[in-house]
Amino acid sequence: MPDAVLQLHPLRALIYRLFCLLALGWLAGCAVPFDRDARLSVDVPTRAFVPDVPLIEQEAFFCGPASLAMVMQWAGSDVTQDDIAALAFSPGAGGTYLADMIGSARRSGQLAMTLHNYDDLLAEIAAGHPVIVFQNLGLGFAPVWHYGVVTAYDFDRDAVFLNSGQQDQMVMPFALFDRTWARGDYWGLVVLPPDRLPASGSEIEILQAAAALERVDAFAAAAVLYQTGAARWPDSWLWYFGLGNARYAQGDLRGARQALSRARSIAPDVPEVRANLAQVRSEL
Amino acid sequence: MGILNLTKRGVAIALSAQLVLATQAVTMAQAEMLGTEAAINKYAQHSDRSFLMGELQREDVRAEIVALGVDPAEAEARLAALSDAEVASILAQMEKDNAGADIIGILFTVFIVLLVTDILCLTRFFNFTRCVR
């Protein structure tokens, strides 16, 4: 995965759109058609659309923060691209690193999980979740790194719709989108409030995203996500174990005891559950 | 002599006490909560299995298996019979061989098919698979 940095030159804000159009036109000319059957191993609807994702015009260099702000505002937050930039942007690099996209979303108390293929990307859109994608809008030897938010697709119209940090929505044919996304190593990011689960990703990936919230001290968000996961996978003790730990970290000993007791009733023999339950009881 | 014996004894007692304490410290003396992340990493194996089972449900994988004359239900039963450690080592090998490749989907299919064919004595790709015939 490239630790790449994106975004345009400061004085190129105007040229950017023009260059984009040029690059897109050129690439579209030689693009191989997108083979839906070969690229997808799951059934997805012919078209899907995520309503109400705001269009935020990015400030210079801020396509990463602007993308995160769009997705988080869509979910009801009032965070701005400047708020996110303070957590994510690297001024020396003139852009936002992939890892900082994930980290800043988590430090803002959001579930953040990466995806890497069309199955997952389109499944998320079909489930009503916008997805941030990392693209190279230029060429391999002359990269124009960019983050955009995929909000819709339509196979009949051969179109992928992106909120791309400009005033208007960006529409790309699938083949062209594929080329720009392939040059970004098919890096996509789902960012959701912790009371919603992504459509893609295994139970373990979502558990790890929840544990990562604990790591950045977003314990309240972690607790909500553990509860959401426990409702979806009621037979899995790890959700209750995490819930107990997140509640303990917030000083909620009774809540922690309740969650850990639940974990123990599901998995009576796990030493970690017994140890933490004993610890909580000793402090009550 | 007496002193030497005493010293030896003292050292022996001190050492064994330390040993006992050290082993107990792991199980007993715990001053803080054990982390969620470590538990996920330690106990995630059962889900590795469900991941492989999920891969077996894929159309392209099933088609390959059927083309080899294998009943997919039998393939699932065989996969269920592998130990957690064996499942983990399949996934570790997949990850190693997939590193840097863009054709993950194809490689995964190949791995799953090889796993099944291994178990059915048609191939021997994974070193731990037991041939049933």
Model feature map: region roles:
Chain A
Residues M1-C30:
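Sec-dependent bacterial lipoprotein signal peptides
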Residues P2, M101-S104, Y248:
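Short, charged, low-hydrophobicity "junction" segments
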Residues A13, L22, M70, F177, ...:
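Acidic, low-complexity intrinsically disordered regions
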Residues W26-A28, E59, H146:
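Generic detector of short, well-ordered, non-transmembrane alpha-helical segments enriched
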Residues C30-G94, L137-L139, E203-I206, A210, ...:
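Active-site-adjacent structural segments surrounding the nucleophilic cysteine of cysteine proteases
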Residues A31-P54, M72-W74, D83-G201:
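Conserved active-site-adjacent core of cysteine acyl-enzyme catalytic domains
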